[in-house]
Amino acid sequence: MTNGRIAFQGELGANSHEACTAAFPDMEPVPHPTFEDAFEAIKAGDCQLGMIPVENSIAGRVADVHHLLPSSGLKIIGERFKPIHFQLMANPGVKLEDLKVVQSMAIAIHQCRATVRRLGLKADTVGDTAGAARMLADHPDPHRAAIAPALAARIYGLDILARDIEDRHNNTTRFMIMTADADPEPPAAGADCVTSFVFRVRNLPAALYKAMGGFATNGVNMTKLESYMENGAFTATFFYAEVDGRPEDPALQRAFEELTFFSERFEILGTYPADPFRKQV
């Protein structure tokens, strides 16, 4: 897709914004304050695609997204892995020795705590990394800095005082590319693919064990299996899973047949090309 609009959660300059421009440079990135708003923009047709983070190599899964996916009606058509780098930025003319306070999301400050400690900065948490940069641009302060992606510094006219200050340089976020198209074009023939799905097993003894048996006996590689509660109920457990392959593959067809027999709900969220980044890890 070479035109149109792509939704993301956050403000202009966020990591999700960077992911949008890297994957779809000809599309217009459209910020939304919440994941719910981003999903709704895709469903309503205001945006043709969405770039949604689902997990981070340090912080783990994005819980809000896992709850939204099954009920969204959206399909996953792609994935992107993005290395995450944080920059320490301030208003023009400010020097490192002038700083006393740093502002950003709590998780961003936590991931850069070595630099924050070394500079002796007091942490001030806000809701968004790019938002921290925007607030600093709107209210200049010679003693305050922000931790945000490099794109935020360019957008809001801030100077980068220290680059790539994250403690761990293998910090990576995985994004899903979403569409409202109920029957999206399948991945190209021959491409390595991933299929994502959700299910809830029937109330039977060893139902989960039995539901999973078909994947082992048919040689299907399951790369992810996560549980989460539905509507806050401890007794209603959903499972989110990912496997290598396409639903039309004979082995996966047989595995899904066995899964559905032991499940009261089963839904494929999408089949999409595996990001080449997977081969680097």
Which residue stretches match the model-derived regions?
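Domain-level signature for soluble enzymes in the chorismate/prephenate branch of the shikimate pathway
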Residues: 1-281
